[in-house]
Amino acid sequence: MKTIVIAEVGENHYGRWDVCRGMVEEIAKHGATYAKFQTYTADNFGKDHIWYDWFKGVAMPEAEHFEMQQLCAEKNVGFLSSTFTIGTTRFLVEKMKCTSLKVASSRLVDYDLLDDIDNRADKVKTVYLSSGMGTIDEIRTAIEHLSKIENLYLLHCTSQYPCEDENVNLRAMVTMQEAFPDYPIGYSCHNHGIEACLAAVALGATVIEKHFTYHVDMPGDDHKGGMTPEMLGQMVQSIARIETILGSAEKAPVDAEKRAVDNLRVPMLDVGFE
């Protein structure tokens, strides 16, 4: 399978690291490319933030970062995390030696953060940039601030949790492909089910990101638009099949059509229907 599949644990562990470990194991078992996390502290958002107490309960401490990174290595699945500040970038790159980073939609116009990542291009080789709430011009400006990054992926996203069907707007991916032909385009999904992800692959997405959960009815917005282990497994298998079905852009007969050529491209007798 060529498509990169990012299964985001995010905050869906509720601050229980035994649950987090179990999620990593399931993500690896069902074939994702990455298990993804979020690197921040509640204080990064400020004590007056409406969700401060929630962030305090689910923020992943440094020790657990290293534990999950080690577990990912043992389970043969990539470790990836979203960075939100220059400090969290420094931690991920300098301490954890991460060469790939995720930039969340909320940081699309945080040019100080993007510049700092760009200045670390000797160590940061890949960036996955989500574009929720963004415009084409804002994406273009973000690209300019990440000009040194060797592998920059642009992810279409709608920052609604969960995202209603009428707000998914997958055709925006085509607009992004036309506007930025030099960059691979992907899709970060908050929609119910896996249908939008599969449609995105059919439209040319090279990366699919979706939250991971044990049950979509668990409390919290990231669960409702998430995927269970079974859904992840089904999505990975379906993406692999879609890649085969898409084939190449060449319009020419395939070897399997030889029998049809021999038996159907024959002279027809002009009889009947008089």
What are the functions of these language-model segments?
Residues 1-274:
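Catalytic cores and adjacent flexible loops of soluble metabolic enzymes
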